[in-house]
Design a protein with these regions (language model features):
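Active-site anion-handling motifs in enzyme catalytic cores
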Residues: 1-271
């Protein structure tokens, strides 16, 4: 390193100092997911919350990504963000992985998917049945919150999407919470309190199934159609009459954990 002595003080040459800073700025893994809004599912779905991939930092899609050995994008319904990031923003990432992102059949057939596939080392989707794309459910299933969930204290609870529930019929006296309220721990505790869970939230649906609760899903778009075993569904105005049809789906939690662990091992083999 070049050292300059000026007036009795030590100064490092500017060029060498910049190199030194870049060396120490290097992280092992950049986890990139949607962080701009207070959506509990978006914050909970990054695999960085559950898997050890070395020294890491979390970033939103709008942030600059520093030099890193690995960039992990996802999860969440963020396909367009992923296309942009893998095309323009990840030049300093040695390896790139898309983990459990919502990818529809239309997305899969798009030029955007071709760009993602060409720019990434591994690509997976939380959507079941997408041809040519590995199925890996949302990594939030790895949370230990599902291992010690409380027993139900209500017959039915309503877990709503904070921005998509205006047309949702309400039932007087039914406990209700939305996906912009508190942490994942708060959400799972509330969802677990219902023997039956009515929800129009993707993660509300997923977490209720992971908990083994009966679920009645009130979808607002097609992303709810791609679970490995879809829940019973109802419309926003007639769901109270359909509560009796709610069903549980067996094996959702262990299956999700196995598939995430297997994908984690593939990621480890990259680095």
């Amino acid at each position: 390193m070049q050292i300059l002595r000026i007036g009795g003080s030590l100064f490092v040459g500017i060029r060498n100092l910049c190199c030194w800073k870049r060396f120490f700025a290097l992280i092992d893994t950049a986890f990139i997911h949607r962080r701009a809004e207070n959506n509990v599912g978006d914050f909970a779905c990054t695999p960085g919350n559950y898997f050890d991939l070395g020294r890491h930092e979390f970033f939103g899609f709008s942030q600059e990504i520093p030099s890193c050995n690995l960039a992990v994008l996802g999860g969440g319904q963020v396909f367009r963000d992923v296309v942009n990031s893998t095309t323009y923003d990840l030049g300093r990432a040695k390896k790139r992985v898309v983990w459990g992102v919502g990818i529809s059949p239309k997305d899969r057939a798009s030029v955007g998917y071709d760009l993602v596939e060409g720019n990434c080392d591994l690509v997976s989707t939380r959507n079941w049945g997408i041809e040519g794309c590995e199925y890996v459910p949302c990594a939030s299933a790895m949370s230990p919150l599902f291992d010690n969930a409380p027993e139900p204290t209500h017959d039915v609870v309503l877990f709503g999407h904070a921005k998509k529930s205006d047309k949702l019929v309400r039932v007087s006296g039914m406990p209700e919470q939305n996906n912009h309220s508190g942490t994942m721990a708060d959400a799972v505790k509330f969802i677990a309190s219902g023997a039956t869970v009515v929800t129009n939230s993707f993660h509300g649906t997923y977490w209720a199934m992971c908990l083994g609760r009966k679920v009645l899903c009130v979808p607002f778009n097609r992303k709810f159609e791609f679970f490995r075993e879809n829940p019973v569904m109802a419309s926003p105005d007639d769901w109270p009459d359909q509560i009796k049809n709610a069903e549980r789906r067996e094996g959702v939690l262990p299956n999700a954990r196995v598939l995430n662990q297997q994908f984690y091992e593939k990621v480890q083999n990259l680095i």
